[in-house]
Amino acid sequence: MNTQTQLLHIENLKLHFRTQKGAVQAVDEVNFDLGVHRAVVVLGESGCGKTSLSKAILRLLPRNVEAYEGKVFLQGVDVMNYSEDEFRQNVRWVGISLVPQAAMNSLNPVIRVGDQVAEPAIIHLNISKMEALSLVRKMFQHVGVPQDFVDRYPFELSGGMRQRVALAMALVTSPNLIILDEPTSALDLLTQANIMNVLKRIKHELGTSFILITHDIATSSELADEVAIMYAGQIVETAHARDFFPAPLHPYSQMLMASVPRLHTDEDPMFITGQPPSLVNLSKGCRFAERCPFRFDKCNEEPPVVLKNGSKVKCWLYD
């Protein structure tokens, strides 16, 4: 893979946490790529490591880190080699921004939303508050927030409007990439659809790339160019969206898609039996083996990553 042709190239990224029970392998040898003006959707069950992946990319690390290593190339530069000051000046909120989970509830209730959105621009773009507020109004226009809302407080806005404000805050420094962690959770269906339309418009108008972290398959499919399936801290399948949604390859991916209710069928959605493994002291074999209907002896060994019809799948079935 030529890292110069990719906006983001992640190679063997690892983030393990130290706990009393042992090391939690939240992100373990993760690999994937993201091109310019593209969107990758990271799908998986709760607790599989999706949010930890976003923290690993942005180096937002807790104190109990046991292992943090790998390569993260942003526009051809391995930013894992940056010092913390270099990372803050060139990557976090500059090259890559984050809309965290429940972002609409993270706004300061006693500060006007315009001032909150302006703050990253003042800090990272080294501009005046007046210039920053002018930029905020432009970002509000892109995300569908009335410009006069710069003087309002968060409690005066609906949940959907606060989510748009959080998105404007991520956009205000003009990053090439925005990571969105469950951006439509806790929103009603109509508001979810509106937020996804905003993201598609931003992608088209500004050329912004996205990593969309979610467990909502139906909603995320509207934005996805690529799909990455995460299970127990690992990426088990990556594929173009046009190939993945009609024909997923990994058994977990197949069962995940079969669990989505469909309107024009009498078939009941599938339930994935069993529980995901604990991320502490994981075995060396396939991490989905205990729940997999296709399990055989080889699954006790670490599965290879196999290239199949343009997709990459971590499974012995395709070796």
Residue positions per predicted region:
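Conserved ABC ATPase "signature" region
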Residues: D78, M130-D148, M257
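A short, proline-enriched helix->beta-strand linker immediately N-terminal to the Walker B motif
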Residues: V172-N176
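P-loop NTP-binding/switch modules centered on Walker-like glycine-rich loops
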Residues: R59, L177-I179, P183-E267
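Conserved ABC ATPase signature
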Residues: Y153-L157, M161
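Short catalytic/signature loops enriched in Gly
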Residues: Q6, H240-D319
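Conserved ABC transporter NBD signature motif
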Residues: E66-D78
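ABC ATPase NBD coupling module
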Residues: D78-S97, D115, I123, D243-P248, ...
